[in-house]
Amino acid sequence: MSVYQTYKGLPAGWVAQWDPTYQAYFYINETFEGAQPQWEPPIPGLHIPPPPGTTTVVYQKDVPRSSDGSRSMTAGLGGFMVGALAGSVLRGHRAYYAPPPPRGPLFGPRIGGGHHGPLHGPHGGFGGRGGGRMGGRGGRGRR
């Protein structure tokens, strides 16, 4: 897997790396050891065009739901996997892992609709807001 990086328009020591999942650049200050990648450019309002040959897709307002109505985990895992697999080197430069998924009006809501509970177990999961309640009765059985 190849990685697209550029230094165009960036301050000395900064590199922009394209994330194909979010169709956006993330930025790293290479002058500091252990610098964390970030979605915000080091210069406010900086615009770097997408890599050559990139086809961009218009942002979809909501995460697609499966047939049972739950939100798909595929989109969130896709960004993680792309970042994890981006360990290849392009033109002798170091490739970086993407930061956590972007937030804000440019990128839309986070996967899971703001649910901050555990992502495992029989009743949690993505979109698992029921907490084990059956039929809207609070899990107390028949009355």
Curated annotation (Swiss-Prot):
Query: Which positions carry the signal peptide feature in this UniProt record?
Result: none
User: Which Gene Ontology terms of cellular component type are present?
Assistant: nucleus
Which SMART domains does UniProt cross-reference here? WW
The region called Disordered is annotated at: 115-143
SUPFAM superfamilies recorded for this chain?
Answer: WW domain (SSF51045)
- Top-level division of the source organism's lineage: Eukaryota
Name which cysteines form disulfide bonds.
none
Residue ranges of the WW domain? Answer: 9-44
Q: Which InterPro entries does UniProt cross-reference here? A: WW_dom, WW_dom_sf
**What is the name of this protein?**
WW domain-containing protein C660.05
- Taxonomic source organism: Schizosaccharomyces pombe (strain 972 / ATCC 24843) (Fission yeast)
